[in-house]
């Protein structure tokens, strides 16, 4: 299976770590032997149609800052678009940074992959948040697969749980803590009685929050995941503009104390229950959703099974890379079934 990897940051590098560490296990257990023929980052690309030496490329990236610095296989300034159009591969992995303003370059990368007959695995929430219905229709039109497990819950199989474990049931509502950064901040404020500003600084120091935390604290990151859940699980044709969003930036210690007096906690909850919303809400302390720290939790309310909750870490390079591996194996199984049918 030939793979093009677009984006070689923390997630992309974690994925090549997994490929190297579990090469024999993946081959023995799943018959999966990926051949990465191209990797791109902001400096350019590394290309070898016979398959790149991943350890070599990792060393070049660490030493020079870009895979394009490889003296044999490097190509300075080569763009993802050029690579997707010119290099033959079965799968394109889109792991560039999330852009919720235009969705680029992710949207163009994904569309180009579809139009050249490539299946797509993405961890980039931007294209899905802005154009989910369009992308799924385009994938179907081109008879290729689109997978995105890592966009919701990182390594926690939230999408798979709803799609497979609750298959045959009717999911009526979804409610969840979908952003670990805001959950950590609210936990710190509640348990240690520190201000929002101090909790945010601690989160940044520990690497839980970005230097510019707007996506997290204003609820935008959670909203992108609401869009993905709504489309994929509940077949709602929504995009980011359809979500009512309120972040946690105005939450005070007094607000949290008032909730505590009632035996409740305030959490940033993303919901799809007729409407699509993200907002701080009071929930009972014994509610399964009431998790602390950087944990995510999602409750699915279905017709037959009732309320089912899945909990796990929502972010991290290796966790998200493990979700990419799940998606790659899923595509491999689909292709094998197609050949046998």
Q: Can you say where each PLM-predicted feature lies in the sequence?
A:
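N-terminal glycine-/serine-/threonine-rich beta1-alpha1-beta2 phosphate-ribose binding loop
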Residues: 1-112
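Conserved active-site and cofactor/substrate-binding residues in soluble primary-metabolism enzymes
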Residues: 6, 10, 14, 34, ...
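Rossmann-fold NAD(P)-binding glycine/threonine-rich loop
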Residues: 98-116, 125-153, 159-163
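A short hydrophobic/small-residue beta-strand
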Residues: 120-121
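Conserved anion/nucleotide-ligand pocket segment
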Residues: 164-224, 229
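Substrate-binding/catalytic subdomain of NAD(P)-dependent oxidoreductase enzymes
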Residues: 200-297
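ATP-dependent carboxylate/acyl-activation modules
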Residues: 287-341
């Amino acid at each position: 299976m030939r793979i093009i990897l677009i984006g070689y940051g923390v997630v992309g590098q974690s994925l090549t770590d997994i490929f190297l560490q579990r090469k024999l296990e993946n081959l023995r257990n799943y018959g999966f032997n990926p051949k990465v023929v191209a990797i791109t980052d902001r400096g350019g690309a590394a290309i070898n149609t016979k398959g790149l030496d991943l350890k070599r490329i990792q060393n070049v990236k660490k030493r020079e800052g870009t895979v394009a610095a490889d003296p044999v296989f490097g190509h300075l300034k080569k763009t993802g678009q050029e690579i997707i159009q010119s290099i033959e591969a079965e799968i394109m992995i889109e792991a560039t940074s999330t852009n919720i303003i235009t969705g680029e370059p992710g949207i163009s990368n994904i569309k180009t992959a579809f139009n050249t007959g490539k299946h797509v695995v993405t961890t980039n929430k931007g294209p899905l948040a802005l154009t989910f219905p369009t992308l799924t229709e385009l994938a179907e039109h081109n008879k290729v697969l689109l997978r995105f497990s890592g966009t919701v819950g990182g390594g926690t199989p939230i999408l798979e749980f709803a799609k497979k474990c609750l298959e045959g049931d009717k999911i009526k509502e979804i409610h969840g803590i979908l952003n670990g950064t805001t959950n950590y901040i609210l936990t710190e404020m509640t348990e240690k009685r520190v201000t929002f500003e101090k909790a945010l600084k601690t989160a940044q120091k520990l690497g839980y929050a970005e230097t510019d935390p707007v996506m997290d604290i204003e609820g935008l990151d959670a909203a992108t995941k609401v869009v993905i859940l709504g489309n994929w699980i509940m077949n709602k044709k929504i995009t980011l503009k359809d979500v009512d969003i309120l972040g946690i930036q105005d939450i005070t210690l007094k607000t949290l104390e008032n909730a505590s007096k009632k035996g409740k906690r305030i959490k940033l909850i993303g919901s799809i229950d007729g409407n699509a919303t993200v907002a701080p809400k009071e929930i009972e302390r014994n509610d399964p959703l009431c998790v602390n720290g950087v944990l995510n939790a999602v409750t699915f309310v279905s017709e037959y099974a009732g309320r089912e909750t899945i909990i796990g870490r929502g972010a991290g390079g290796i966790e998200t890379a493990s979700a990419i591996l799940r998606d790659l194996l899923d595509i491999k199984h689909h292709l094998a079934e197609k050949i046998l049918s």
